[in-house]
Amino acid sequence: MTLGKTKNRKRNVITSLELDPAIMEQNNIRFQSTYKRISENEVRFEEINCENADYLIVAFGSMSRICQKTIELAAEEGIKIGLLRPITLWPFPTEAIARHANHVKGILSAELNAGQMVEDVRLAVNGKVRVEHSDV
């Protein structure tokens, strides 16, 4: 609990733990409302060449820059690849990825880590298309 220097100030409890079930339920409802509002208004991503893509790469950070060059080289060979670059990982661009699952042949989750994003991509497509992972 923080009060600062002012003793008359309302308490600011810094925890989500509440032992009273009624208050805990109200807190959870408030948290879920906040999460929903954030998910609706704060998701950010960039789509590059996704309109007519046969394949989609989902990549963020440094890997997305590498993948941009990859889709340029693939285009020279006649391969249509799009890039979806999440700018926010939370909230994740689930709906945008799900839309592309209806028209691409496959999705690659390209990451410079052990695969923290690939499961989110798989959840987004809900089995509609195969999702592979590359951890270069």
Which ranges hold each PLM region?
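Acidic beta-strand-to-loop metal/phosphate-binding motif
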Residues: K105-E111
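Short, glycine-/Ser/Thr-/acidic-enriched flexible segments
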Residues: S62-S64, T88-L89, N113-G115, V136
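Conformationally flexible catalytic loops at phosphate/diphosphate-handling active centers
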Residues: M1-E47
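Peripheral docking tails and interdomain loops at the edges
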Residues: E111-V136
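Short, conserved loop/helix-junction motifs that constitute active-site signature segments
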Residues: A98-H103
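Redox- and metal-dependent alpha/beta enzyme cores, enriched for Fe-S-associated oxidoreductases
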Residues: R44-I79, L84, W90-A96
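A short helix->loop->beta-strand "cap" motif at the edges of active sites that frequently abuts
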Residues: V104-K105, V129
